[in-house]
Amino acid sequence: MVAFSDKQEGLVNGAYEAFKADIPKYSVVFYTTILEKAPAAKNLFSFLANGVDATNPKLTGHAEKLFGLVRDSAAQLRASGGVVADAALGAVHSQKAVNDAQFVVVKEALVKTLKEAVGDKWSDELGTAVELAYDELAAAIKKAY
C-alpha cells in the first residue's frame, strides 16, 4: 500500500486540469517528447503514422485518456493505497510488448508536459505526486498483463 494524501491528489488533479485547458497543444508536447526520446515508439501508436498532428482526434483522445488515468490513479491511491488497472489495458500493453524502458519514456514525457502546462505552479511536491501516481498506474498495467 502507498500513502497518498489529499494534497497530493489535489496537486495531480490541478495538473490534469491545466493539461485539459489546451489538450491539442499539450498532446503535441507529450508525443513529440516521446518520439524525441524513443523514435521507435511511433510504431506503437497507429495515430502517429503521419507524425504528431494536434488536429488528429485519436492523438488528442489517447493523450487525454492517459493523463486521465494518471489522475484516476491518484484518486485510487488516496482512497485505497493501491491502483487497479483494467484487464483490457494490460492486454493492449502486453500485445504491443511495452517494456519497462518505454514506461519510463512515457513518464518523462508526462512530467515534461505537465510541467509546461502548470508553468510556475510546478513544484517538487507536484512532480513527486505525478510520478508516484504514474508509477503505480504502470505497475498495475504490468500486473494486468
UniProtKB/Swiss-Prot annotation:
GO terms for molecular function: heme binding; metal ion binding; oxygen binding; oxygen carrier activity. O2 binds at residue 62. Residues 3-145 form the Globin domain. Heme b binds at residues 46, 65, 93, 96. It comes from the Eukaryota. It is found in: Cytoplasm, Cytosol; Nucleus. Root nodules. Nitrated in effective nodules and particularly in hypoxic conditions; this mechanism may play a protective role in the symbiosis by buffering toxic peroxynitrite NO(2)(-). Nitration level decrease during nodule senescence. Phosphorylation at Ser-46 disrupts the molecular environment of its porphyrin ring oxygen binding pocket, thus leading to a reduced oxygen consumption and to the delivery of oxygen O(2) to symbiosomes. Gene3D superfamilies: Globins. Leghemoglobin that reversibly binds oxygen O(2) through a pentacoordinated heme iron. In root nodules, facilitates the diffusion of oxygen to the bacteroids while preventing the bacterial nitrogenase from being inactivated by buffering dioxygen, nitric oxide and carbon monoxide, and promoting the formation of reactive oxygen species (ROS, e.g. H(2)O(2)). This role is essential for symbiotic nitrogen fixation (SNF). The keyword Zinc does not apply. This is Leghemoglobin-2. It holds the Pfam family Globin. InterPro entries: Globin (IPR000971), Globin-like_sf (IPR009050), Globin/Proto (IPR012292), Leghaemoglobin-like (IPR001032), Leghaemoglobin_Fe_BS (IPR019824). Belongs to the plant globin family. The gene is LBII. The modification Phosphoserine is found at residue 46. Its main location: cytoplasm. Transmembrane segments: none annotated. GO terms for biological process: nodulation. One of its GO terms (cellular component) is cytosol. Keywords: Cytoplasm, Heme, Iron, Metal-binding, Nitration, Nitrogen fixation, Nodulation, Nucleus, Oxygen transport, Phosphoprotein, Transport. Monomer. The keyword Cell wall biogenesis/degradation does not apply.
